[in-house]
Amino acid sequence: MFTGIVEEIGRVESIKKGPKSLAITIRGNKIFSDLKIGDSVAVNGVCLTVTTIGNGVFTADVMPESINMTTFTNLKVHQPVNLERAMLANGRFGGHIVAGHVDGTGRIINREQTDNAIIFTVEAPKSVMDYVIYKGSITIDGISLTIMRRTDSSFSVSIIPHTLSETILGSAHIGTEVNLETDIAGRYIRHFMNLGSEATEDKPKKSMQSLLVENGFI
């Protein structure tokens, strides 16, 4: 589990391509203070397992599913990436609960300067937007952010100068593809609210309101 507070910007040193998978080697600095083989590291928000460590770099395998669901389809050598180690049980929790399981990718369609902040607007597929709510949390390339507004097909977030300087969002522009992970709590709530709501021949589909009443929420 992660918090969405990026620890540093690393850099892709090499990419070894398999038939449908990747083995990527990444150079970092801060994260190596206690990193060991088997640890989890979020790379642009994608949870990967460290397989080798040496000389300021670590290697991790990327499965076909992770490639298909993320921007790793276009990953390049020397590309900067956001890095975060899995959180410790006794550590501070500065962002929100991030699983490192990317739901899909989005595309930046607007970048707007507003006083000391940059507002990014991201276009996302319906499978992601279904879980995007006003003032809710979302992870963009591993960064915990708050949704300031939404439409049916896009949402906007405001980025402070510190986040811009400490993450790869500082160099993001219109057209940049990003990894998106919605709030896991919202995903679970929607899943459980939909349980038993599927229609059958002798049981019509229940509305969300009737389910809330039936379960004592309203």
What is each PLM-predicted segment?
Residues 1-218:
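Conserved loop->alpha-helix
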